[in-house]
Amino acid sequence: YYMLTPDGCYYNFSGVGNTLNCNHPVVRQFILDCLRYWVVEYRVDGFRFDLASSLGRGEDGGPLSRPPLLESLAYDPILGHVKLIAEAWDAGGLYQVGSFPDWNRWAEWNGRYRDDLRRFLKGDGGMAQAAVQRIIGSPDLYQPDKRPNASVNFITCHDGFTLHDLYAYNQKHNEANGWNNTDGSDANYSWNCGTEGFTEDPDILTLREKMCRNAFAVLLCSRGAAMFLAGDEFGNSQYGNNNTYCQDNEISWLDWSDLERNAGLFDFVSRMIAFR
């Protein structure tokens, strides 16, 4: 059931210590049976696979050109019509954005969109051409025969900063996680607009909201499927923590009172969605 090294240790392409041997016939059938059950019995109409590139590795850990599991998912009579979304990389360094084996069925989280647009929006030099590529559907990544929604465009997700925090913090602040602020990504491409974290300065607060509006405007006018993090539409904050997996408290909860405080942002996002 697991990928093993020649000396019997676990391969770790998942970041959690072991990796399921997805393309072994027995394991592949087990996965297909589980997904079919969710579709037939619970009417689930789509699946998003975390670290999906690990699904395309062989028994020795190497990437396969035609992974049997991914091909089976694409052509299965039950699963062949549900939405399939891949986080097209894994914890072992395999990065397949634009090249994930998809049989014209899978959509991909476009990590290049996130990184390039973050850098462009905060004014990094030399990013205009990359931003154009992302906005028009990333044709440098996805060939003309790809569906327009093959790219799932996003600037924020459950991993990393919220949109509010992207423009309120230059550095992550994960001290509450207990790892001396060593966990979580350092490649945030964020900008605090002049002050780190909380402020009552009206000029900085106005600038931060403008940056959030810029991000939503670009995202919702880009070719491809648009995705944003719940709470971003009303300025939810995680207080600079960009890795809240272990926080079941005010750090990770949605503060619905922000909906009233940031009604202007919420109205703008609603209108942008209607415009799209």
Residue ranges of predicted features:
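Short acidic/histidine-rich active-site segments
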Residues: 229-234, 238
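The substrate-binding groove and active-site-proximal loops of carbohydrate-active enzymes
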Residues: 12-29, 52-64, 103-106, 194-208, ...
